[in-house]
């Protein structure tokens, strides 16, 4: 499958962006989320470092350390996505490997828009400040309109931040497409996208969501 992706991307600038299964026993529809650690690290290696292109991984911090050591690669930049949760884990990290994100490409609202200096900037057409590396974005709740049947769905705003700092002339490749949020972010931001998903149910969810964006 990934050889086909490589052929499709040949001659283009590809970057892998993915939120892989976390290997902590999530109840996915048709695949096991509890491999032994060696097999899991090898799986991540095969779809990142072995592809010989820059990549961006979203994971829990302690697992990103293990992946970086296994891949023998140090991230060029790490951001944190923080969210309210009733579980022990309340943030995930986004690690950029072999690519330097440009945070000036994503503008976020000013925190103090009533400040005199900020009002002047807005009047000058400066409608936001560059993205920080600490993102407070809520997880998707079961009652959210955005929610699908995928048990580990990423918020669209997170993925738009992750992708929006990458070079514009880029093919984004997600080897663990899930519900298709990476593809939707690419569509809204103007990036080309290739996604892979082995579960037919989740693939169809992603396909339907992407068709709605066309």
Question: Which residues make up each language-model segment?
Answer:
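Core catalytic lobe of class I
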Residues: 1-194, 201-203
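Conserved SAM-binding loop
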Residues: 206-207
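Class I S-adenosyl-L-methionine-dependent methyltransferase module
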Residues: 211-214
């Amino acid at each position: 499958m990934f050889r086909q992706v490589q052929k499709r991307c040949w001659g283009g600038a590809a970057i892998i962006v993915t939120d892989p299964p976390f290997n902590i026993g999530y109840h996915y529809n048709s695949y096991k989320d509890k491999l032994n650690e060696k097999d899991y690290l090898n799986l991540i290696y095969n779809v990142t470092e072995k592809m010989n292109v820059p990549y961006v991984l979203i994971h829990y911090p302690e697992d990103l350390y293990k992946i970086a050591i296994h891949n023998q690669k140090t991230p060029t930049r790490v951001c944190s996505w923080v969210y309210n949760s009733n579980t022990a884990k309340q943030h995930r990290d986004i690690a950029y490997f072999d690519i330097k994100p440009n945070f000036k490409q994503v503008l976020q609202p000013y925190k103090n828009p009533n400040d005199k200096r900020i009002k002047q900037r807005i009047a000058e057409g400066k409608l936001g400040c560059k993205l920080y590396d600490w993102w407070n974005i809520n997880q998707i709740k079961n009652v959210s309109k955005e929610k699908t049947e995928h048990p580990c769905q990423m918020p669209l705003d997170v993925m738009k931040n992750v992708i929006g700092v990458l070079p514009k002339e880029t093919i984004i490749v997600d080897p663990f497409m899930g519900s298709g949020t990476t593809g939707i972010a690419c569509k809204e931001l103007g990036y080309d996208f290739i996604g892979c998903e082995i579960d037919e149910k989740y693939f169809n969810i992603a396909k339907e969501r992407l068709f709605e964006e066309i």
